């Protein structure tokens, strides 16, 4: 009997503690701050399991025809790339400020089944910024996007631009930000040393964790880019550029200068932010 009473008391204390935590507003809900690892895991696991469960009833039509994929590519560019990016194309600046960060769909296109992709695009996801397209696009358009998302992981930036029939799309805001950051620090001034603590904070704001596994930053469980653990001990950046502070700053600010057809897009990283991110990456040993 004592054990039962003790368990009841513990349960009541736990409920009261949880209620107090919520009521007092102790959890930081700002979009500039990352989720804790346990919260991120709960959110991600809940979302994934819900999609798998509810998408089972979706019947998948024939997918993968050339015209369907081409249509899906065009629709994806207009409606999806603003948040999720595209091969060699960055997300819009506003999307980098969403938390959780919109997923890079290169891995999603491989790991997720077509019925799961359709269900998610059709119904959207609460508390993620992912809208429901059910009443905004026709059903055949949604399936065309699904067909393209399945093709996306195998498409290079050069192929994407060529197949789209125009130059790499980039928002005027991002283009302006990139141009402005190029003249932020005059060559006559000695750049300030990087701040690794700020760098850890800033690296989240540019969505780097969507593609890379970064120690100390909560993000994608299955990153599509190389992990950045022990970056401070590596000899090269991207397998081709000597790993020095100045080279890392140059790489962060304009990666396509070194790999024109690489998947890593230009994000309009400012001089100061690049130096702080560099300082944090150099601390990873």
Residue positions per predicted region:
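Short helix/strand-bridging catalytic loops that position acidic/His residues to coordinate divalent metals
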Residues: 99-107, 131-132
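Amphipathic alpha-helical recognition patches that constitute DNA-binding helices
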Residues: 71, 104, 116, 198, ...
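Periplasmic c-type cytochrome electron-transfer domains
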Residues: 2-77, 82, 86, 93-94, ...
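Conserved N-terminal glycine/acidic-rich loop preference
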Residues: 163-196, 209-233
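Periplasmic/extracellular electron-transfer cofactor-ligation site
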Residues: 73, 77-100, 126-129, 153-158, ...
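Short, intrinsically disordered, charge-biased short linear motifs at domain edges
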Residues: 65-70, 193-199
């Amino acid at each position: 009997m004592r054990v039962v009473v003790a368990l009841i008391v513990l349960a009541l204390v736990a409920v009261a503690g949880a209620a107090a935590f919520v009521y007092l507003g102790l959890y930081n809900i700002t979009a500039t701050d990352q989720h804790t690892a346990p919260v991120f895991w709960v959110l991600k696991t809940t979302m994934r399991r819900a999609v798998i469960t509810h998408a089972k009833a979706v019947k998948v039509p024939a997918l993968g025809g050339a015209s369907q994929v081409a249509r899906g590519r065009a629709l994806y560019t207009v409606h999806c790339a603003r948040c999720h990016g595209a091969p060699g194309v960055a997300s819009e600046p506003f999307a980098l400020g969403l938390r959780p960060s919109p997923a890079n769909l290169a891995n999603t296109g491989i790991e997720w089944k077509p019925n799961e992709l359709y269900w998610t695009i059709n119904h959207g996801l609460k508390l993620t910024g992912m809208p429901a397209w059910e009443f905004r696009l026709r059903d055949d358009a949604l399936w065309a996007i699904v067909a393209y998302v399945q093709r996306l992981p195998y498409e290079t930036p050069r192929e994407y631009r060529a197949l789209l029939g125009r130059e790499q799309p980039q928002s005027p805001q991002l283009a302006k930000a990139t141009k402005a950051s190029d003249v932020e620090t005059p060559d006559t001034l000695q750049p300030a040393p990087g701040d690794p603590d700020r760098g850890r904070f800033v690296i989240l704001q540019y969505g780097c964790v969507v593609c890379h596994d970064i120690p100390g930053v909560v993000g994608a469980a299955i990153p599509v880019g190389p992990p950045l653990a022990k970056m401070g001990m590596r000899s090269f950046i991207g397998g081709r550029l000597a790993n020095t502070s100045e080279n890392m700053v140059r790489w962060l600010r304009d990666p396509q200068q070194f790999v024109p057809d690489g998947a890593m897009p230009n994000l309009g990283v400012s001089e100061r932010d690049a130096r702080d991110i560099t300082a944090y990456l150099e601390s990873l040993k």
